Amino acid sequence: MANVVVVGAQWGDEGKGKIVDWLSEQADIVVRFQGGHNAGHTLVINGKTYKLALLPSGVLREHKLSVIGNGVVFDPAAFLDEVTKLRAQGVAVSPENLRVAENVTLILPLHRELDAHRESANAATAIGTTRRGIGPAYEDKVGRRAIRLMDLADLDTLPHKIDRLLAHHNALRRGLNLPEFDGKDILKELTALAPQLLPYAETVWRLLDIKRREGKRMLFEGAQGALLDVDHGTYPYVTSSNTVAAQAATGSGLGPGAVGYVLGLCKAYTTRVGQGPFPTEQDNEIGRKIGERGREFGTNTGRPRRCGWFDAVLVRQAVRTCGINGLALTKLDILDGFDSIEVCTGYKLDGKEIDHFPAGEGAQARVEPIYETIEGWKEPTASARSWADLPAQAIKYVRRIEELVGCPVALLSTSPEREDTILVQNPFEA
């Protein structure tokens, strides 16, 4: 029996929500370990659509414990709003089935405002953030001035922590010619939020250690994707946290040995939201066709995603940096009906062939994809639930991806419905 970490092997939006929900049936605990409410996902259960951003997908299943780990940045307003919406849909969410790390960093209104101001002021060099305060909150965490959830329980020290935070932020705001924040207003707001948030607070590392020793199965749910990792992604067009699988240990307080099997998710093609390099992007009719058929619009932002062919080089790189044991390949059905499909197998950089994506921003912009053409298929793969339901050419496509990225496919998803999943290897039993 292994614990399982689910991470994106591309730029996010790979369908992690559905796969995590599908796997959570076998898990006792579902843990979010990084990111914030900037990475939304949509789940369809019994014909009903649920949209999550901050909460673990496990909240949609009865008798499961969901945990938000210390590696997450936590927006109180977004949290309470999401809980309210889920309750309105009949989902039970309470401290009985949801725990939040007491040492989680809080996202405050000043973080959201700073994030938005930076993006607007630097339009020519904007990263393409969701303007939800994720980056500024992580900056304060690293700068050792963040307000954390447990601080709301100590009103004697909270004012001093707010003063320390504002010493930094008000200096920035003076430089940006923005009005300063008043610490008393922030204290009043946090004091009002405390009774609603503190019942969820937990010493998460201790809780998870106890559950691990009891033999409980844990599912660690990553947000975004490996190519958005602050160290291993397409820097600076990345998120502000580590998104690779190793962060599951750091972001939950467990040791690396507790991680277990790593399942990497990738689409049968490639998408990206916002700015940054995208070697296989198809800014043409093919890209538009993929986007329309795949309904490629951001869950949170509604922004259209950029679309392109499958990039085996980038996914292979994610397999290595995340230690991925098996892939969950999603949205194969979107490629139904194409006469031929292109797959990127390498790059040319300044006239030389290379087998990896370079780290430098300039080099990333100059790489040219090397494509292999694969015959398409006309028969539908949508809603397939076994290999026997798949066209022979679709199976060949999957097998070729396995060869190119050096990793087997463990799961194959053929629609947003959780039942439309072909199981090759159960990650919990690997």
Swiss-Prot record:
A GO molecular-function descriptor: adenylosuccinate synthase activity
Ligand binding (Mg(2+)): 13, 40
Record-listed E.C. numbers: 6.3.4.4
Signal peptide: none
Residues the record marks as active site: 13 (proton acceptor), 41 (proton donor)
Listed Pfam families: Adenylsucc_synt
SMART domains in alphabetical order: Adenylsucc_synt
GO cellular component term, pick one: cytoplasm
Chain residues that bind IMP: 13-16, 38-41, 130, 144, 224, 239, 303
Binding site for substrate: 299-305
Positions annotated to bind GTP: 12-18, 40-42, 305, 331-333, 413-415
Chemical reaction(s) catalysed: IMP + L-aspartate + GTP = N(6)-(1,2-dicarboxyethyl)-AMP + GDP + phosphate + 2 H(+)
Keyword GTP-binding set for record: yes
Subunit comment: Homodimer.
Job of this protein: Plays an important role in the de novo pathway of purine nucleotide biosynthesis. Catalyzes the first committed step in the biosynthesis of AMP from IMP.
Family to which this protein belongs: Belongs to the adenylosuccinate synthetase family.
Protein name: Adenylosuccinate synthetase
Organism: Bradyrhizobium diazoefficiens (strain JCM 10833 / BCRC 13528 / IAM 13628 / NBRC 14792 / USDA 110)
